[in-house]
Curated annotation (Swiss-Prot):
Inhibited by AMP and ADP with 25% and 35% of activity remaining, respectively, at saturating conditions. Activated 5-fold by diadenosine polyphosphates(Ap[n]A) with n>2 (Ap3A, Ap4A, Ap5A, Ap6A) at saturating conditions. GO terms for biological process: phosphate-containing compound metabolic process. This is Cobalt-dependent inorganic pyrophosphatase. Keywords: CBS domain, Hydrolase, Manganese, Metal-binding, Nucleotide-binding, Repeat. Homodimer. It comes from Clostridium perfringens (strain 13 / Type A).
Length: 549
């Protein structure tokens, strides 16, 4: 498995989550050898896209899970066999590479079958079928290679040999009893036998013992269009070896193949292997092309993926499969929740307005100047998370760091913020689902599940005609997720307050937390701009009180 570190923000990523991951990846790549890859767990918001576009930075790649996939394994990178390859060549390859089976693929590398040692041995151990070369359409090239033979005369019109294999170990006058037209005859150096076989119109004459037929025999073969080859092996050895010239597609397993995909989870492949008994399994990619094979030992010698979490520490907000990964670091500015790691980690949690402030501090504490792009991303994220220093979560450190980064990025925070918020708060063309889920976070407080979404907008009134439809969606989401209460904050940065919409089984939780009375499931909360500092704490207090009663 490639040794990399994934740096990820939370699900439904906001600007701080995306920008902190990108910038921290730059920091890690400047301070360590192991490559750090920034990733995201959801779509990029309009606001975040504005920041990325302004500084010419690509969005991080999407990461579905950190559970191990087949593509993460050190699989055997073995070129599949072509279907026409001889058993002899296949056996040599498998012996040299210590393989018990090998994939067979067509010219486009699409899987045709699997050739195993048991397929090959069965060909030898089964009752001899003298017509096997005809049935398998064995080529002359395979026969020449297998017998280390040389061609003395070739019938170019005949691609395969239709008859049975016969060792001509009898008198010339007895040949008619055993030889039919089109047969493959193995003979020694007796000219009268060779001539009689040609007259009987065999399709292939194999002369053994390293003997070269006379000119008269060759001329007779040319006249009758008979292919003649010579081999250094004796007749017994030639008859024993010739079966090795069969093409692998004749003996390979074609039906009920069990292949795995590079995108399959290792845990699912383990189940597949427990239910089957193959020694190796072909691996195919998204284009159905063979890329290698794996065996059971590949699943045993696996390593966990390495992850650094930024802007979150709750498992429910993190990447799928986190429990199967190795968390190396957590950089966050939220409450400490249900983190649990197998080893000691670098855990940095500070009560600041933005995780990006902490990431920026990491640069300067280590004497590293962030690039213009990284500085711009961090600056934009701080502006976003602190609502241009208006959020109660904002600290003097956030303001100082933002202005320091702005100098490197070559922007004026106030001017940049105006355009950024304008781009980010537009709800035009968005569906109810897109609006709500753009920045939605679930929380579990004393066993009670709640969810809070937040949308920054400069036009709360323009949204209100959608209120009924939004509340219906919120109730559906609360029921499907088992949430006791669900809330949407429509935050007006300019007027410094939030209109809240509340749904779920227990909307009174919000009323008690904010000491308000909901009218038609909504009310305005003056001065409330921060979900983290002004919404989650009062919700936590009320729920804790209710549970303890």
């Amino acid at each position: 498995m490639k040794d990399v570190i994934y740096i990820t923000g939370h699900k439904n990523p906001d600007s701080d989550s995306i920008c902190a991951a990108l910038a921290y990846a730059e920091f890690k790549n400047k301070t360590q050898d192991t490559p750090a890859i920034p990733v995201r767990l959801g779509n990029v918001s309009q606001e975040t896209q504005y920041i990325l576009d302004y500084f010419g930075v690509e969005a991080p790649q999407f990461l579905e899970t950190v559970k191990l996939k087949v593509e993460d394994l050190e699989m055997d990178k073995i070129a599949p066999l072509a279907p026409e390859v001889s058993l002899k060549m296949a056996w040599n390859i498998m012996r040299d590479k210590n393989l018990k089976s090998i994939p067979v693929a067509d010219g486009n590398n699409h899987l045709l079958g699997m050739l195993s040692t048991s397929n090959i041995t069965a060909t030898y151990m089964d009752i001899w079928d003298s017509n096997i070369l005809a049935k398998s359409a064995t080529s002359l090239d395979n026969i020449l290679d297998t017998l280390s033979a040389e061609a003395q005369n070739i019938n170019e019109e005949r691609k395969v040999f239709p008859g049975k294999v016969v060792v001509a170990a009898m008198q010339a006058e007895s040949l008619k009893e055993f030889i039919s037209e089109g047969d493959i005859a193995i003979a020694g150096d007796r000219a009268e036998i060779q001539a009689e076989l040609i007259e009987l119109k065999v399709s292939l004459l194999i002369v053994t013992g390293g003997h070269t037929p006379s000119k008269e025999i060759i001329e007779l073969a040319k006249k009758n269009n008979i292919t003649v080859i010579t081999t250094p092996h004796d007749s017994f050895t030639a008859s024993r070896l010739i079966v090795q010239s069969l093409p692998v597609d004749y003996v390979m397993t074609k039906d009920n193949l069990v292949a795995v995909s590079t995108d399959d989870l290792v845990e699912d492949v383990k189940v597949t292997m427990s239910e089957t008994r193959y020694s190796n399994y072909p691996v195919i990619d998204e284009n159905n092309k063979v890329v290698g094979s794996i065996a059971r030992f590949h699943l045993i010698s696996t390593h966990k993926k390495k992850v650094i979490q930024v802007d979150h520490n709750e498992r429910g907000q993190s990447v799928h499969g986190l429990e199967d990964a190795e968390v190396l670091e957590i950089i966050d500015h939220h409450r400490v929740a249900d983190i649990q790691t197998g080893n000691p980690i670098y855990f940095r949690n500070e009560p600041l307005g933005s995780t990006s402030t902490i990431v920026a501090k990491r640069f300067f504490e280590n004497g590293i100047r962030p690039s213009r792009e990284a500085a711009g991303l961090l600056c934009g994220a701080i502006i976003s998370d602190t609502l241009l220093f208006k959020s109660p979560t904002c600290t003097p450190q956030d303001v100082k760091m933002c202005r320091k980064l702005a100098e490197i990025a070559g922007i004026v925070p106030e001017t940049f913020a105006k355009e950024m918020f304008k781009a980010g708060t537009s709800l035009k063309g968005k569906s109810i689902e897109e609006i709500f889920n753009a920045d939605f976070k679930p929380f579990t407080i004393e066993g009670v599940k709640v969810g809070v979404a937040q949308v920054n907008t400069m036009d709360i009134e323009g949204f209100m005609p959608l209120k009924g439809e939004m509340l219906d969606y919120m109730n559906q989401k609360a029921e499907s997720m088992g949430l006791e209460m669900i809330m949407l904050l429509l935050t007006d940065i300019i007027n410094e307050g939030s209109q809240i919409l509340v749904a779920g089984r227990s909307p009174e939780i919000a009323e008690e937390a904010f000491k308000v009375k909901l009218e038609d499931s909504t009310t305005f909360l003056p001065g409330v701009l921060s979900r983290k500092k002004q919404v989650v704490p009062p919700l936590t207090q009320i729920i804790t009180t209710r549970v303890s009663k």
